[in-house]
């Protein structure tokens, strides 16, 4: 989370510097913190720049370190990330605090410049810090520097509390939010069917397909969850633009998280036959029932943290965060998809609005796949086949795969637009705002496309080749791997030997050889 200047006056720049994985990020009590291996150049060029802009231009009051390690050192105790880069290079004079329970030492933290342990009461200071001072691992001068920065933040907050609260829900701010929602929208695929911009007349008939028209994704969840003054839905904004008589609505299918759909992998009890066993009870009970209570709740939101493991013979049954602890399967979608297809044939231009939501994008979790939820991909393919002028709009804060992209003429990607989501999307559709945004991340064609060799802690890449002995005698061969840096800034050989492997093959033998570099 980076607060980009000049929009930040009092915000903390969170998670310095690199956090590419949220899975187990809160498990600070076990040795399961993810570790990122970053070369210094890779760290400084694409990663540090975004934080440098926020710190230099907006001068935030505090920055926060991430949980994990970079090249073997925890971010919260890395002097390069806390002292050398922000304070020496950027001249940052504010506070540095850790993410909740995100520290793992005492003297290393203080000496690196970590000022504040969160939350309180502290676990790694007090008596431990006193012993570190007595043993001369931490100097009094270093502690005094951190104390001054903490007091500086306290004085800043006290001064801000005395100022009157200003009403931010003004017409000027609404117009600004509307603009900042529409401008970053990305036109992923050109207007091949020449349907954009849409026209505001009574002759053109539209179909609004997808659950995001009336229930849009306005923001993520957890730490990014903020209650807005209002929410402009795309449906209401479309009504403002052309009226209710110019379009037909269709659900198509849900993209929000519910019980899983009934797929062919579900089998009947006690057999391998596909389907489910249903039991209907049409008789009213005569008296009180001794039926088992399946589910009860007293809160709307609960977090469960497990710091232990289950016995090997125990099958765990639980649900992910944000879901009610109930089990079952969901029927439907097939009829809604058929309805959407029929409606798409009847209108001039169908517009599908779907994507992810706060059900899938929130702090402390990774998505299990890059695909769109449920049967959304099927909905898009079938509607596009029924009407080639279909416009696809996806809402998401992260990348999604689009297996239907080659079959659709127009693809638009909208980010989470907060309270002006609806107006921002409709402004793009009718040409009031040009979709001039660009992707800050890669949208892979499928999950197999992104290279994963750089994710290996040792930066290992394996190359596979097939080798066959076509002769009549046993033989040996050395497989060699040469590389060439096509964009090196310094003079290097045209070919560099990086790895080799010697193999022995019998006559006619065909072998698959893996060479690791």
UniProtKB/Swiss-Prot annotation:
GO terms for molecular function: beta-glucosidase activity. It comes from the Eukaryota. One of its GO terms (cellular component) is extracellular region. It is found in: Secreted. It catalyses: Hydrolysis of terminal, non-reducing beta-D-glucosyl residues with release of beta-D-glucose. Signal peptide: none annotated. The keyword Hydrolase applies. The active site is at 99. Belongs to the glycosyl hydrolase 3 family. This is Probable beta-glucosidase O. It comes from Emericella nidulans (strain FGSC A4 / ATCC 38163 / CBS 112.46 / NRRL 194 / M139) (Aspergillus nidulans).
